[in-house]
Amino acid sequence: MNTGDTPCKTSLRVTTWVDRSLHHLKLQTEFCMNMANRSHSQYHITPQDHDEDARGYLLNEPPAHGYDHDRLGVGTPPDRPVSAYSLTESYAPNASQLPPAGSGGFGDNGFGQYGQPQGFGGPYDRPLSAVHDEEESWMQRQQQPGGVGQAGGLRRYNTRKVKLVQGSVLSIDYPVPSAIKNAVQPRYRDVEGGNEEFMKMRYTAATCDPNDFTLKNGYDLRPRMYNRHTELLIAITYYNEDKVLLSRTLHGVMQNIRDIVNLKKSTFWNKGGPAWQKIVVCLVFDGIEKADKNTLDVLATVGVYQDGVIKKDVDGKETVAHIFEYTSQLSVTPSQQLIRPTGDSPQNLPPVQFIFCLKQKNSKKINSHRWLFNAFGRILNPEVTILIDAGTKPSPRSLLALWEGFYNDKDLGGACGEIHAMLGKGGKKLFNPLVAVQNFEYKISNILDKPLESSFGYVSVLPGAFSAYRFRAIMGRPLEQYFHGDHTLSKILGKKGIDGMNIFKKNMFLAEDRILCFELVAKAGQKWHLTYIKAAKGETDVPEGAAEFISQRRRWLNGSFAASLYSLMHFGRLYKSGHNIVRMFFLHIQVIYNVLNVIFSWFSLASYYLTTTVIMDLVGTPVVASSSAAEHHGWPFGDTATPIINALLKYLYLAFVILQFILALGNRPKGSKFTYIASFMVFGLIQGYILVLSGYLVARAFQQPISEQIKLDSSEDFVRSFFSGSSAGGVILIALITIYGLYFVASFLYLDPWHMFHSFPYYMLLMSTYINILMVYAFNNWHDVSWGTKGSDKAEALPSANVTKSEKNEVVVEEIEKEQEDIDSQFEQTVRRALAPFKEVEEIEKKDVEDSYKSFRTGLVVSWLFSNILLVVIITSDNFNSFGIGKSASVRTANFFKFLLYATAALSIVRFIGFLWFLGKTGLMCCFARR
């Protein structure tokens, strides 16, 4: 048989870990002949009639003739050729290709629907559709089988006794489903035949603080156990993102690892062992309570997680983190397609070493980083650690570009890539002004801000969503200072921890990544610097609603402001570093630049208001011709109406600024969503009006030829006329060039100008809201620092690991040992859930009672305050002269005081009459009262 380079060759390789019978080889050969002419598309192939065997294999359903009984257990499928079959067809709910429930070889073994044991006392004794609550369904799946089933009947499982490491550390290897281990390419199984890396998943219940997760205490990780050098540790931090966001990040990371493994001319990766063995991917989930349980199904499909494994405590000692380890070649795309290897194609994903850390309680992102650096980092000792937030999608070869920055610069301590907003298919999200504004903000930061700071050698913030650090550079003081913000260390650190911090320091740790950046550059005796790497790109979601946008920026603005002051106050520590005189010179320039930025930020509220009013006055106030000024008429509504409209807009501007203070001091953004949307609209309309007036002002300034305004006779005349002449031409030219021109020039030089056309107009309209709404809310909520650990009711219902003594007086845990067919059957359920089409649940905001009370209070205060302000303005302002309520402000003031005096007198007379009536009535009653 000569089929060329087909999957048949791969399937017929003799593996070292199993002895296949000749009968199986014959079946595989026949199957391969049918598969030889099929397309090798990686993602999807329309199922044909002869795909039935492949579909049955992927579903772990044996053929009618059954399988030989080998050491992998009854019903284990033979090693089939790897196809490009899309498991969405097989596992999607109500798929037409599915066989009837209970059919196949498993039905002969007493298995009922979906191949589950009859009478099984767990969540599988009824269809999952009956379990409406996702959380409840997940909790049921964690219970240990083997007891009396709720449906009646008794299912007995074999048990095994697992010895605890050093008498206290529970670490167990669990067999993975057949479909997962059979998906691994034989060439990797051959190489790794001496261990169980692809055969079993390792689970460790960590009952200690991250600082105590050490070899000395009995904890270990597979890459070190296999004596592998970890060059690159890629960390994905997760909070509550859905399975699409997690898959987007995870699949992007695996594709980037493939880029590294496929390097042909590398002088590093192709030496000293396979490249994939030098890379570890670590997922850290911040608590069971907040995690989307569908993401756990995705990880279980990849092989990194299994239901029914985790233990809430070991011998009464609470588990702090559940750690899973497995090496997999599987991935799930954001569109819920399962990616498997196809033959020996270079497009196959290489094996990826996974560490999945599921923290039992929510204890914030900084604690997740403590698990990463202090626990896993100290054991693996990587050269470079890359940090990625779940939801951020790294572009092709981006992780390689980040690593190359460290490889080519021995003094590089940290780096970040370009983060840009996810704009949706065809850029449809740009129709949302908030998304467009943030897109422009990200772009300009990547084009102007990051390159400038990178030139100085100190990037003020390496965003945690997409950045990298040299591990040995941040060890020591940088990490120690960084982790002072971890509230789980408050008891250990005492006054140096969160409990001993003032409100300024607590806000500083809202942007703790800025603290790490400064501490890294200022590290004593070292000359580490930070840089921006243009070739590394990451795509992330941005808030699309006003409430979410405001809440996000509160933390960013307060944290960055406090951290900026921290770096300025501690600038003297740079003199203890090892930077040379040239670097120190540029760092001094940078600190002056940062001081000016802080000052301008502090006075930005007044600056925006003064700019608005000055432009209105320049354009709207009519000017009579004189020897020093030309005649100007009020524009655009004429000499009479323009000043009145401008005055109303000024008052409206002030009113909405005051409204922001009232909202910020008492209301949640989600509780006042529509008020904030109205505020964005009002400030946007006023800013649009100002832009129109500015355009008119520019046109009016250049009515006089520029040659007459700016003298070119000599350099002295040019400087005098340009900067201090009576005309405004020079000043306007400076403004146009620095505000608009530089953005366009820099964007075109960067070869990325498109944001200037689709996002810049939105930014021009809403730029005042960054101060009037975002900064006002942030500063008014300076006290809002949320740190507390949130406990988990879900964790309380998890099973425990009860310790006993063996015959040899060893500390052991008795663990249920499932048969392979049970594992495969439950895996079928898992993949069904993982590959089901994602349906985004629209969050229905229900205003709670407290929000309704706060909204009423806000309305009451606003009505009271603004009505009083309106009265004062009407009485004292000359802008209301033409409304027929008085010839001038002085006349209205006099009339108001007359009215006030007469009204006060009248009310006093009424009170006096009432007094006389009461007095007379009391006297008369005294005379006629009975004694």
Curated annotation (Swiss-Prot):
Localisation per UniProt entry: Cell membrane
Pfam families according to UniProt: Chitin_synth_1, Chitin_synth_1N
Bilayer topology annotation: Multi-pass membrane protein
tRNA processing keyword on record: no
Keywords: Cell membrane, Cell wall biogenesis/degradation, Glycoprotein, Glycosyltransferase, Membrane, Transferase, Transmembrane, Transmembrane helix, Virulence
Protein family according to the UniProt entry: Belongs to the chitin synthase family. Class III subfamily.
PANTHER family tied to this protein: CHITIN SYNTHASE, CHITIN SYNTHASE B
This protein's name: Chitin synthase III
Gene name linked to the record: ChsIII
